Design a protein with these regions (language model features):
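Short, well-ordered alpha-helical segments
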Residues: 4-38
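A cross-kingdom feature marking charged/low-complexity
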Residues: 41, 46-69
Length: 69
């Protein structure tokens, strides 16, 4: 019986709408070249602000797991 083998890649994504949108955008982009995505782990979240303190961009770094072979 063959065991499933996974691979993990790390990606970064950003959005002007929020963290959830940044996650969705990152997964959508990576799914164009990677098949069999099984999950993602968000390991860092940050924001960019304007001079007056308003959030202008939400950023995430995530590890995406997918099956190979």
């Amino acid at each position: 019986m063959a065991a499933d083998v996974g691979k993990v890649i790390e990606i970064s994504a950003a959005s002007s709408k929020g963290f959830e949108d940044a996650i969705q955008a990152g997964l959508k982009k990576v799914s164009k070249t990677v098949r069999h995505i099984k999950g993602a782990w968000i390991n860092d979240m940050s924001v960019v602000t304007s001079d007056d303190g308003k959030v202008t961009e939400w950023r995430v770094n995530m590890k995406v797991t997918f099956l190979i072979g």
